[in-house]
Amino acid sequence: MSKRKTGALRKEQNSKKMHKITTYYNNESNNTIDFNQTHKIKKSIELVPQSVNQENYILNLMDNSKDIVVVYGPAGTGKTYLGMLAALKALRQGDCKKIILTRPAVAVDDEKHGFLPGDINSKMEPWVRPLLDILKEYYSMKEVEYMLKEQIIEITPLAFCRGRNFKNAWVILDEAQNATPSQIKMLMTRISFGSKIIITGDVEQTDRRTKDNGLLDLTYRLTQNPVSEIGLSEFSVKDIRRHRIIEKVLKLYD
């Protein structure tokens, strides 16, 4: 290939690259974000079950007739991970306009975090870090910061959900065993059109007294009086996929 043709080809490639960059920043300046642009997406979002119980959970997540999905079981079984992936997939497909991440602000055992400076995202970030870590697998830090700023991804304490109406949103309540029965009832009654609520947790890993364990209370109520619009999934130690040692650690503390 001649130098002239090589130079022309390089110039054309640079022009296309600059067009992509210009489009990207124009979209940001116009306060829009296109989740379908291939240069903005790290990888496709696929929910692949690795056990029968995970398959049941994914079916509940993808079932439009299930307005609320409740899942409980030990650490490392994919409760939070699969729930977050389903929410991101719904957001990317335009099935919802935002994702709301929440959890009870209850410290592990006697651990005290004290006062955290900054806005609500900064204050809640340590509490929802596992959910944000999943988000960062699929979007760059710049994209994550943008979505937080525009409240496409919203972080809120569970107590702040009182009085709100969640419309066209997927809401994920993590560590639900640390919520009280009244808090979980409050959250579920906030649902509105086009929304889904995912409630995850481990009834055995509560930092509250047993009678205050909202997740344990909810699962008991659902087993006694099933509701067709609420999907219920249970995981066991056999569903642990994070690391094989977790099952042995849990048995060690039984």
Regions found by a protein language model. Give the residues of each.
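Interdomain "pre-motor" coupling segment immediately N-terminal to P-loop NTPase/helicase cores
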Residues: 1-37
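Conserved helicase motor core of SF1/SF2 NTP-dependent helicases
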Residues: 2-4, 16, 37-46, 54-60, ...
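Residue-level marker of regulatory loop/turn positions in helix-turn-helix DNA-binding domains and
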Residues: 50
